[in-house]
């Protein structure tokens, strides 16, 4: 049912946009070398425009993705890097202009940073929104092109979904994105984990699923998230920036996190993802506003400065 709803939602989002496209690796980088242990120093309190009591970011974590480490205790238990009351905000399946921008505005009002796992079709269809995410200081990871269950696909097709999404997102963002990946439906396989490890791409599951795809009303969504968070005490929170009620709930959710003493941790990568030339070539035409072989959107090359648009 979730797959049907998501396919319909992404399909609807693309109307009017151009067609755009449990075991981890044997060895992991040492957490103490990745700057992601609980002992990592807190971020100095930053001023937040027009909000002296902003939630802000308590800690920035840099992840060394060598070997493709896995995070999120629902699937991967190698790294317990969060302190009590620390939360990582993550969003899947976007960007979608209206809802993603509403979420970005709420995050900006509280000077909070998040990680967005983008779907290639929407990243390519709305590169301006993806660049807004990047400009806001958030981290961009990938989530395939069309959101299939990769565990059910032949290896080469699954590999293409991963690599094309990396190429599209990097092209749309204007620079290589983070080597962070989340499996659609959180369905991995040993073969795909091994492949991602060979590509030095970290894999993210979750500690707390908001189940916002079931479309609870904003107040109910906030109550569910806070209740589960209070039980767990900390965690990587999974949400979706294509969900209207998630966008509506975001300002109050951030207030609830602050009121209950939770702190935000921002995930960053030690180095950006390395795209593969083969897939860069295959996806040249899959980003709106880009000519083949051009790394700049048309709007950044030709701009009307007087007269009618």
Which positions does each model-derived feature cover?
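Short low-complexity, flexible loop/linker segments enriched in glycine and/or proline
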Residues: 130-133, 156-158, 219-222, 279-283
